[in-house]
Amino acid sequence: MNRTLLALLAIAVILSACGKTENTTPAASAPVAANVADLAAKAQVKAAAASLPQADAATPASSYVDITSGHQLMYSYLALSGVPPDYAAVAQRISREYAGSNDAFRKQEVLDALKPQIDAKVNEAKTKRYLRYQINGQGALSPYAMDKAAFPAKFADAGTYYYMYDNGDYKLAFTNCDGYSLLKVDQEAARKIEAARSGYKDFAIVVYAYAQEADLASNQVKAQIVKVAIKLNGEEIPVNQAR
């Protein structure tokens, strides 16, 4: 009986050891699987962005339209969406008379008068897809990184979008965010920008972008960043390199 008991104990030890090995293997591979999934997701996002209409980098600055109102983003969104405008919803945004009236007949008269104007704005947005948008530099740039000779930038982080207070229903987001996490300018300009940043002075990041598509799920105009400049004391300082 002692020999039988010893044999059973030996088998139990072997099985226990095998079980521990099998349990630890998946735990060790879990981070690897997560990393692979993350890389695959990023590759998919890049591929999707590459499949969209692309900007012509040679387009002159004079062809870019300054975005100063959320109504512009609304018209751009409608132009890119291919969906007929909801005239009543647009009128509610752009006309105080329409929004403030309780008279059904008067509202209809105002709406009928606005429809041609709305159509004209949407058609104009179809032909003007190059956009220029200014972002407050304070908070968008981190302190100058000496080891990288560049400003770490947060204005184009994945998931970031922008909207205007006069019409916050429509937003602007960028499709090639990963290429603009570090902004390089010449050394003299970097000193001036860092002095403004650290001294809480006003400066702006000027984004030149190309409207590519409308995201119907989020009311966003998706745009490709073409180039970036930093505006300080009324002068645009071109970003020499971004990555």
Model-derived segments and spans:
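Residue-level marker of positions within ordered structural domains that often coincide
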Residues: L8, N23, D112
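N-terminal Sec/ER secretory leader and immediately downstream segment
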Residues: A28-T127
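Extracellular/mature segments of secreted proteins
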Residues: T25-P26, V185
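Mature extracytoplasmic/lumenal regions of exported proteins
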Residues: E124-R243
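Detector for methionine-enriched segments
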Residues: M1, A27-A28, M74, M146, ...
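Sec-dependent bacterial lipoprotein signal peptides
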Residues: M1-S16
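Bacterial signal peptide processing site
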Residues: C18-E22
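Long, low-complexity intrinsically disordered regulatory regions
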Residues: S16, P26-A27
